[in-house]
């Protein structure tokens, strides 16, 4: 494994740092509204790097403004990149000033890219036998690696020496330029050879040698085991000019004239007065305190490394990241439990503990089929143990009999007085349930604690450990490998498995201590966690394990019908295009739409090609029929591949049912999401969606009961805004869309036309989601002026709605977040952004999130209450939650009774100023129940 040499010359790619930091910490600002994210991120990475390496010589190199020789050689060089965001541009000069104030040499050479400055300095030092460490995330720097030059990527702290380059790219450093020249580099808009991608480039270089050797031996290309090798030689010959150009563009210059030598790049003393001024202005409180308390060197910092790719901070998190303590993980306290004596000793420890962390290890992530291969435990004092239940590799040690071990540990897991902590413990609960253990005493789920604190962050254990503990956990892939050859956990050597599994439990325990402390600062959030998120995980676990029955034969027939419709759409597309083509080929679509039909290019891909994404096709469909056909074709293809073809394959062989996975900690608003299958994405209003729902059926003797909140977000809007017009309409049981139409168009309820009602409905729901006049005009097919007129009329009739929207925007700007009726918070880091697009997007979210989030909270409360009522009743099962709807499987003769129970408890889940209305339907399948 590569190691950093003692006291190398450190060369930092400042431009690479700059963009990484900006995107890792979006829209952090100080009290004056000045953006600080890029400055904070770059300085933090620099301080961490210097603390780690302890160099005496260093330089941070940034790109200069203006063009370079590459721009003059190739006009399209980097031309696809969007202009630098204003929020980033404003931070560059103060960042440069702070870097210099820290005593770090900073270089910006006019007309020369940072890469070329770094390349020149690196080669200069290497030629003198000095060791060099280049800190960058750019792959083109790999061409500089030699016996003295090494790269470090601060995103994952990985090191690349010569051997590392070969392992990562499959070629040595001296062929990196050839590699980039052949396949091109989308980051810099280097064209490469058309049709040559990563695999082809590697095949050529590994099979023949350098690009010069390839062109000298083109006749050998056809013999290579590369796809399309027979015609590749001709393609290379035709693209020779592009290849040569790309080679020059990709080559980092190492002979730039500089007015500085490597000996002059000394890390100097920091300018304390300047740092105090800057850190105070930009509110870098941790660093300010350090300087004020006498830290006069950049290496005298207690700041912990922040991996920029792992955590996107919001404004409230900056101080949390800055003050992250470094938790010591002592793996010497981890044990493996292989004997009965070991297990007995640990059972005594667990019985004596009031709080334990528990984690399962399995051979799959499918909770309905995974085998339990081990359990880990941790105590508050840092002790942890791994109980292996299954080992499958040559010469593996003997484990305790699985049934014996589980029987011994079962009383602890089922004891409600021994409180449990887990990370995504719903999964563990389901695994234990399938092994006859009812997990009780669950008090904390660290994933849900984090989600309750701030729903917009990442909540997996690895990220939480970095963020709150300053600890880098053992990566599963480092033990098991990747891809098809990845080992399952029972195949990992026991010593490594113990370290990994015990660490999971230990880190979970320490995360609970950190997160619970933070949550207790917000009593409303503690209540939200205890009464909603924690009990809901058990409800979801039971729902998931119950699953839903599907009619595979009906889906098979629907797949055939969709296949026929797809064929018909393809024929229509061929006729409109004037030729047959592959509707799934982006390249062919680009040629047909933009070259042949000459439709306007609305967006471009990162590589500069015309985009054919759904948004573009929807827009183009206003001016041509073909894009409309393509949108329909894509929609049907997705339904076929995602549902009608796939659902029958997802039927569990033991239960005969499909078991989705519900996710509590994914959406920012508090809504649940699901996967395998994704129930939320089944279309509601079209015929294909109805047919898919018809395949969700009840078992014999049972019926499907579907209960759906009626217009819940509009009712929440009435409650939150206090608008008397909306309140009256809902309280009197009026058709809200007809009532809105009557108000807007100044007619009686009886005189409202279907078109007027349709327009009013679009306005009602559109405003909830912050729709503009332009968006409304598109949806209704009317002029923008007419759409604006409708919106103006709406706000005249419902003035409190407009006032609510204004107030919520201002409140969000003042506090940085909005709340649901039950206190759930949604942080809005872009709400004060100087970037108008980002700010307006955040304002739309600020309007919608309180309604969408409150609706999510209400249905969660209903689920928890209904679960209490029906949990032990064999005549009813809650089987699905989709949007504002709960679906049950009920014994047919009990439908009338449970129908009323469901309606009653769902409508009582919250007290609003207008009634909550639940519509309940019954049928033999999900569609019939609507």
Curated annotation (Swiss-Prot):
CDD domains: DNA_pol_A_pol_I_C, DNA_polA_I_Ecoli_like_exo, H3TH_53EXO, PIN_53EXO. SUPFAM superfamilies: 5' to 3' exonuclease, C-terminal subdomain, DNA/RNA polymerases, PIN domain-like, Ribonuclease H-like. The keyword DNA damage applies. Residues 328-520 form the 3'-5' exonuclease domain. Its EC number is 2.7.7.7. It comes from the Bacteria. Keywords: DNA damage, DNA repair, DNA replication, DNA-binding, DNA-directed DNA polymerase, Exonuclease, Hydrolase, Nuclease, Nucleotidyltransferase, Transferase. Signal peptide: none annotated. It catalyses: DNA(n) + a 2'-deoxyribonucleoside 5'-triphosphate = DNA(n+1) + diphosphate. Residues 524-930 are annotated as: Polymerase. Residues 1-327 form the 5'-3' exonuclease domain. PROSITE patterns: DNA_POLYMERASE_A. GO terms for biological process: DNA-templated DNA replication; double-strand break repair. GO terms for molecular function: 3'-5' exonuclease activity; 5'-3' exonuclease activity; DNA binding; DNA-directed DNA polymerase activity. Belongs to the DNA polymerase type-A family. Single-chain monomer with multiple functions. In addition to polymerase activity, this DNA polymerase exhibits 3'-5' and 5'-3' exonuclease activity. This is DNA polymerase I. The gene is polA.
């Amino acid at each position: 494994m590569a190691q950093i040499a003692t006291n190398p010359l450190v060369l930092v790619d400042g431009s690479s740092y700059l963009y990484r930091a900006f995107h890792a910490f979006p829209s952090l600002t100080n009290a004056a509204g000045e953006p600080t994210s890029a400055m904070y991120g770059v300085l933090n990475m620099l301080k961490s790097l210097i603390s780690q390496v302890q160099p005496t010589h260093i330089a941070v190199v940034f790109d200069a403004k203006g063009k370079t020789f590459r721009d003059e050689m190739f006009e399209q060089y980097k031309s696809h990149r969007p202009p630098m965001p204003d929020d980033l541009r404003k931070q560059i000069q103060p960042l440069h000033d702070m870097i210099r104030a820290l005593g770090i040499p900073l270089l910006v050479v006019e007309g020369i890219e940072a890469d070329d400055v770094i390349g020149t300095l690196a080669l200069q030092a290497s030629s003198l036998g000095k060791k060099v460490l280049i800190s960058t995330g750019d792959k083109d720097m790999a061409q500089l690696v030699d016996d003295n030059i090494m790269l470090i990527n601060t995103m994952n702290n990985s090191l690349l020496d010569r051997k590392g380059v070969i392992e990562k790219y499959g070629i040595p450093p001296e062929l990196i330029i050839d590699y980039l020249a052949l396949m091109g580099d989308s980051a810099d808009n280097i064209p490469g050879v058309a049709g040559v991608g990563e695999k082809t480039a590697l095949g050529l270089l590994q099979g023949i040698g350098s690009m010069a050797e390839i062109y000298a031996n083109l006749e050998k290309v056809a013999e290579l085991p590369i796809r399309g090798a027979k015609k590749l030689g001709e393609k290379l010959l035709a693209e020779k000019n592009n290849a040569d150009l790309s080679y020059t563009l990709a080559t980092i210059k190492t002979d730039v004239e500089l007015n500085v030598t490597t000996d002059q790049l000394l890390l100097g003393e920091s300018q304390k007065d300047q740092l105090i001024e800057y850190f105070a202005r930009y509110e870098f409180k941790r660093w300010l305190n350090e300087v004020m308390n006498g830290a006069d060197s950049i290496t005298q910092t207690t700041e912990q490394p922040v991996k920029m790719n792992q955590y996107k901070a919001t404004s409230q998190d900056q101080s949390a990241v800055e003050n992250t303590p470094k938790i010591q993980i002592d793996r010497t306290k981890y044990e493996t439990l292989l004997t009965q004596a070991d297990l007995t000793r640990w059972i005594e420890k667990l019985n004596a503990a009031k709080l334990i962390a528990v984690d399962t290890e399995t051979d799959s992530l499918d909770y309905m089929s995974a085998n339990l291969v081990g359990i880990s435990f941790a105590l508050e004092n840092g002790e942890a143990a791994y109980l292996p239940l299954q080992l499958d590799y040559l010469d593996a040690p003997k484990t305790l009999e699985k049934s014996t071990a589980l029987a011994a540990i079962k009383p602890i897991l089922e004891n409600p007085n021994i409180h449990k902590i887990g990370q995504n413990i719903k999964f563990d609960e389901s695994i234990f349930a399938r092994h006859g253990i009812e997990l009780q005493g669950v008090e904390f789920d660290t994933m849900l604690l984090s989600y309750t604190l701030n729903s917009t962050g990442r909540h997996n254990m690895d990220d939480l450990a970095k963020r709150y503990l300053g600890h880098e956990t053992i990566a599963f892939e480092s033990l098991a490998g990747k891809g098809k050859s990845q080992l399952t956990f029972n195949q990992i050597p026991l010593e490594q498995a113990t370290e990994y599994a015990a660490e999971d439990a230990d880190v979970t325990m320490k995360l609970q201590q950190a997160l619970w402390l933070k949550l207790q600062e917000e009593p409303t959030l503690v209540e939200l966690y205890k009464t909603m998120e924690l009990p809901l995980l058990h409800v979801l676990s039971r729902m998931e394990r119950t699953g839903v029955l599907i009619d595979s034969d009906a889906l098979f027939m629907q797949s055939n019908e969709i296949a026929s419709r797809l064929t018909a759409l393809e024929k229509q597309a061929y006729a409109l295009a004037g030729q047959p083509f592959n509707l799934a080929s982006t390249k062919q679509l680009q040629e047909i739409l933009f070259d042949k039909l000459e439709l306007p290019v609305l967006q471009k891909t990162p590589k500069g090609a015309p985009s054919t994404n759904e948004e573009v096709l929807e827009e183009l469909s206003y001016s041509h029929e073909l894009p409309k056909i393509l949108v329909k074709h894509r929609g049907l293809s997705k339904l076929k591949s995602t549902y009608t073809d796939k659902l029958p394959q997802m039927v569990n062989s033991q239960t005969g049912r499909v078991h989705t996975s519900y996710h509590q900690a994914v959406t920012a608003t508090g809504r649940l999401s699901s996967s395998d299958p994704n129930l939320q994405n089944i279309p509601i209003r079209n015929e294909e969606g109805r047919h898919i729902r018809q395949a969700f059926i009840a078992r014999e003797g049972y019926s499907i009961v579907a209960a759906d909140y009626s217009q819940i977000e509009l009712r929440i809007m009435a409650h939150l805004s206090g608008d008397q017009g909306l309140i009256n309409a809902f309280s009197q049981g009026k058709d809200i869309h007809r009532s809105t139409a009557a108000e807007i168009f100044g007619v009686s309820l009886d005189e409202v036309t279907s078109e007027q009602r349709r327009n009013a409905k679009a306005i009602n729901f559109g405003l909830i989601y912050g729709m503009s006049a332009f968006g409304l005009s598109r949806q209704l097919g009317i002029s923008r002026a007419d759409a604006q007129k409708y919106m103006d009329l709406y706000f005249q009739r419902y003035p409190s709605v407009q006032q609510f929207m204004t107030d919520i925007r201002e409140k969000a700007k003042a506090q940085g977040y909005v709340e649901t009726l039950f206190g759930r918070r949604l942080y809005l880091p872009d709400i004060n952004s100087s970037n108008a697009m980002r700010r307006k997007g955040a304002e739309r979210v600020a309007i919608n999130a309180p309604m969408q989030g409150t609706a999510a909270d209400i249905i969660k409360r209903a689920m928890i209450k209904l679960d209490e009522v029906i949990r032990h009743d064999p005549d009813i099962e809650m089987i699905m939650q989709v949007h504002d709807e709960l679906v049950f499987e009920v014994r047919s003769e009990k439908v009338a009774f449970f129908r009323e129970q469901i309606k009653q408890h769902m409508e009582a889940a919250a007290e609003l100023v207008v009634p909550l209305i639940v519509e309940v339907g019954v049928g033999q399948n999900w569609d019939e129940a609507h």
